[in-house]
């Protein structure tokens, strides 16, 4: 029998190596090594096991925003609500809350433009909500509040009137859609009050209160505002305190309470101390939250001025400037405080920055920063109803410090007073101050004096001749 010697009869021979099979095995090994390395570095995570940083939900951002709001950190609350809207851009309730907080935050801003910018942002937010739900009572009520706040901003009269008309319409529709919308009734009462419709305003705020609205901060705040407009300041204080009890970390409420106590201090000097306590409470809350807000320090300084304590007033005014050395309005406020404290030369530097603007060297000089290490340029503030105080105080300081033949203060004052006359010639309170200072400099209102050439030397320190103490333009309510 023939036997093939190449065939093994007792065992199966191993197959020869397949190069494709070997290559596949190597690829699998390489892939496994890569997976193990990625797992070790945390780049991938095993299935069915929660990731270490879970994905945020809309509700988590809303809760975070509510927490920041209750703590009084309005900017952080706004950021949280904005993040919630990224996930649910059509959530009208979130947009309404965001717009409301933006209105509150506008109360804490120091310049007209900052307030206007924030309110316009609020209007954009609530307009999107209305586009999604045009018949939502909550949305329309909040929109009425935003429009009402814009109507009270420093805008041309025609724009203010248009915003107020829109606000009234939105509030009425909101109430018609839901007669239990207590905030809409409160906002409508505030709008009516601004239109001097006192009886109707009183009726609507009473409806809001009697239906359970006394547990809502805005209802209490607006009731306080109505009493304030009626000049019943003690009742206004009581209701502002009720509002602050509901929302204890909103500093603008404490500032308002302080302003009213300070106003009452002219009749009972012990009220000044109470005013200082509320302003200090607002400042303390800001420090606790890490918020740089000069408003409470300005209010404290103005209170000390009324108490006749010029040094304490100047210290607090300077503290406000340290907090915000970039804000033109802060220079104006500090300048007015210095003027009232009879620090006329110091006020001149500050007010020049606010009214005319100043370069880095001049702003350092105003802040008494020596050597000058900061590059802070201050832009001039436009002449408005709120900044005219800085303009005529600056002109008064120039006139009071003028030394004939030694400076050109009167020429500069004439320019400032002409600007004021062009816009406020029909305001007798402003014109009385302007006229008194013009008389010191012998300024003809119809003619700008030529610039005098100052002499190279000056003998002694000039003694200012103060004109009438600058006052805020009278309004229906005490101002900070």
Indicate where each model-derived feature is located:
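TPR alpha-solenoid repeat register
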Residues: 94, 139, 184, 218-219, ...
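Ser/Thr-rich, Proline-interspersed low-complexity disordered segments
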Residues: 40-71, 79, 83-86, 90, ...
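Long, contiguous interaction/recruitment modules in multidomain scaffold/adaptor proteins
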Residues: 2-56, 176-187, 196
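Residue-level recognition of tetratricopeptide repeat
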Residues: 66, 100, 104-107, 145, ...
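Canonical tetratricopeptide repeat
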Residues: 97, 142, 187, 221-222, ...
């Amino acid at each position: 029998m023939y036997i093939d010697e190449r065939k093994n009869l007792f065992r199966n021979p191993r197959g020869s190596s397949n190069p494709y099979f070997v290559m596949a095995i190597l690829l699998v090994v390489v892939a496994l090594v890569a997976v193990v390395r990625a797992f070790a570095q945390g780049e991938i995570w095993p299935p069915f096991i929660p990731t270490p940083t879970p994905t945020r939900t809309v509700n988590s951002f809303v809760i975070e925003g509510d927490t920041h709001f209750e703590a009084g950190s309005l900017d952080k609350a706004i950021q949280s609500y904005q993040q919630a809207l990224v996930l649910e851009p059509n959530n009208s309730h979130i947009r309404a809350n965001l717009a409301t907080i933006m209105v509150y935050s506008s109360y804490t801003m120091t310049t007209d433009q900052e307030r206007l910018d924030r309110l316009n942002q609020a209007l954009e937010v609530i307009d999107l909500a209305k586009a999604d739900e045009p018949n939502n009572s909550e949305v329309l009520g909040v929109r009425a509040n935003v429009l009402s706040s814009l109507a009270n901003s420093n805008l041309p009269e025609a724009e203010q009137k248009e915003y107020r008309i829109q606000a009234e319409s939105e509030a009425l529709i909101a109430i018609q859609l839901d007669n239990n919308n207590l905030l809409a009734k409160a906002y409508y009462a505030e709008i009516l009050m601004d239109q001097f419709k006192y009886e109707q305003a009183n009726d609507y705020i009473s409806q809001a209160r009697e239906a359970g609205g006394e547990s809502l901060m805005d209802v209490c705040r607006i009731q306080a505002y109505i009493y304030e407009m009626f000049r019943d300041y003690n009742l206004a204080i009581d209701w502002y305190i009720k509002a602050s009890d509901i929302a204890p970390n909103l500093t603008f409420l404490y500032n308002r309470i302080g302003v009213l106590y300070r106003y009452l201090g002219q009749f009972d000097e012990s009220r000044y101390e109470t005013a200082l306590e509320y302003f200090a409470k607002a400042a303390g809350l800001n420090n606790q939250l890490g918020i740089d807000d000069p408003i409470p320090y300005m209010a404290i300084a103005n209170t000390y001025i009324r108490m006749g304590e010029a040094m304490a007033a100047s210290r607090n005014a300077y503290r406000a400037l340290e907090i915000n050395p970039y804000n033109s309005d802060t220079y104006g406020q500090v300048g007015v405080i210095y003027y009232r404290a009879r620090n006329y030369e110091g006020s001149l530097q500050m007010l020049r920055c606010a009214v005319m603007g100043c370069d880095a060297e001049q702003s350092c000089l105003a802040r008494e920063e020596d050597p000058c290490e900061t590059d802070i340029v201050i832009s001039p503030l436009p002449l408005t109803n709120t900044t005219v105080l800085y303009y005529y105080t600056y002109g008064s300081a120039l006139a009071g410090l003028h030394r004939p033949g030694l400076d050109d203060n009167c020429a500069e004052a004439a320019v400032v007073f002409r600007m004021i006359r062009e816009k406020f010639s029909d305001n007798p309170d402003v014109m009385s101050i302007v006229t008194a200072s013009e008389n010191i400099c012998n300024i003809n209102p119809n003619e700008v004096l030529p610039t005098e050439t100052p002499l190279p030397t000056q003998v002694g320190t000039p003694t200012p001749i103060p004109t009438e103490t600058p006052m805020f333009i009278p309004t229906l309510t005490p101002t900070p």
